[in-house]
A protein has these predicted regions:
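Bacterial Sec-dependent N-terminal signal peptides
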Residues: 1-25
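Carbohydrate-interacting regions of secretory-pathway proteins
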Residues: 22-253
Length: 253
């Protein structure tokens, strides 16, 4: 009787663990499908509002954003054609802007448009602290770049759509220069999914053995706090080249 009872308890525990594992992650494509691609940029539809989506930029004001380690909004950014864009600085890294709020589990959506040779990125799980000069010292990056016209030779993990210096894109669904691309990022616990123009380009599990091996054998070995934080700000990177960002939306999971 004790043996039977013990087996039943083990079975219940296994069932609970399996169910917990399944419920801990959401379907990124289902979240992606909640957005209306035909909606007017920088607005939320009633359906999106019902699903819990927030608008992080209305195309007119910089409310909700500030310069990294600054109190206000930096002069090297401006709003042009209802989009955030940079005042170019000759290709040199400059002041990134970050969300005022911090996020742990979320879905993030933004449209971006590249100029020739442009370089930028969406960096997340950022710690804001004067001891760091740039957001990329702590946060992973969804790479945004015109790698075709970038002057230096790049590795696959540095190309458009990559999880920068970690995971190369599995597909290359890029739009031509001057056209809007749609970037979608889901961070759900340790599970990260990057979608570009309707196609999943990167999926990985943070803190997995594979992730740790990549982190400890590449660029980030010299950045001890990179990937350390599970909650943080989201950044639009300013690499001194011109990129437009609009239609920025977020859903807390």
């Amino acid at each position: 009787m004790k043996t039977v009872t013990f087996k039943i308890i083990l079975g219940i525990m296994a069932f609970v663990i399996i169910c917990s594992a399944k419920s801990s992650t959401r379907d990124p494509l289902a979240l992606y499908a909640e957005l209306d691609k035909n909606a007017t940029p920088n607005t939320l539809t009633s359906k999106e509002k019902e699903k819990g989506w927030q608008l992080l930029f209305d195309g007119k004001k910089s409310d909700g954003w500030h310069g990294y380690n600054l109190k206000g909004f930096p002069d090297c950014w401006t709003i042009e054609d209802e989009s955030f864009t940079m005042v170019t600085t000759g290709g040199q890294e400059s002041q990134d802007i970050i969300t005022n709020s911090v996020y742990r589990n979320f879905a993030f959506s933004v449209d971006y448009k590249l100029t020739k040779g442009a370089n930028s990125g969406i960096i997340f799980q950022i710690a804001e602290d004067p001891k760091y000069k740039f957001p990329y010292e702590t946060g992973p990056e969804f790479q945004v770049i015109d790698h075709t016209n970038w002057p230096d030779k790049l590795e696959d993990v540095q190309t458009n759509g990559a999880n920068y210096a970690m995971y190369p894109p599995m597909a290359k669904p890029y739009k031509p220069l001057g056209e809007w691309n749609h970037l979608f990022l889901v961070v759900d616990g340790n599970y990260v999914t990057q979608i570009l123009n309707d196609v999943i380009v990167v999926r990985y599990e943070k803190n997995s053995e594979e992730w740790k091996k990549l982190k400890d054998s590449g660029k980030w070995v010299n950045f001890p706090d990179w990937g350390k934080f599970d909650e943080g700000h989201i950044s639009l990177q300013n690499h001194g080249t011109k990129v437009w960002y609009r239609n920025i939306k977020l859903k807390v999971l």
